[in-house]
From Swiss-Prot:
Lineage: Bacteria, Bacillati, Bacillota, Bacilli, Bacillales
SMART domains noted in UniProt: HTH_MARR
Source organism of this protein record: Bacillus subtilis (strain 168)
SUPFAM superfamilies: Winged helix' DNA-binding domain
InterPro entries: HTH_MarR-typ, MarR/SlyA-like, Tscrpt_reg_MarR-type_CS, WH-like_DNA-bd_sf, WH_DNA-bd_sf
Protein name per Swiss-Prot or TrEMBL: Uncharacterized HTH-type transcriptional regulator YxaD
PROSITE patterns (alphabetical): HTH_MARR_1, HTH_MARR_2
GO molecular function, one term: DNA binding
Superkingdom of origin: Bacteria
Domain (HTH marR-type): residue spans on this chain: 11-139
Signal peptide: none
Amino acid sequence: MQNQNPVELIEYELTTFIRRAVYLDQSEKRTGNLERSSYLLLRQLDEFGPARVKELAESFKLDISTLSRQAAALEAKELIYRFSDPSDGRVSLFTITKLGKQLLKADQQKRLERYEQMLKEWSTQEKEMFGELLQRMNKAFID
């Protein structure tokens, strides 16, 4: 792939990266006990606090019905808690529970260890640059 258009290179590498990440997430080599969707939902609630289903669905670019199913599964496992919005009792908010925080923290630690291992040959500057570029790419997907 020498002398390749940079955008072609990015497209190919991103496609390959996503395929490998999904494989690892679904294989016996999976990092942690939480499924990717559960991990992301718990992480969102932990980082940004209570949220409505609609807000969460918009954040992840999912149908409300899909997000509702994911939330219901986490609620059944007591990893998140539903309560009435104090400003509008007709609306429910979700928040992460203590158990949810514990499982999230354990999974996050395993994920960080895996990434530390994968990036062990990278300099701090390379990791920072890659993180910044990934943030920009993620933002470009939703803009």
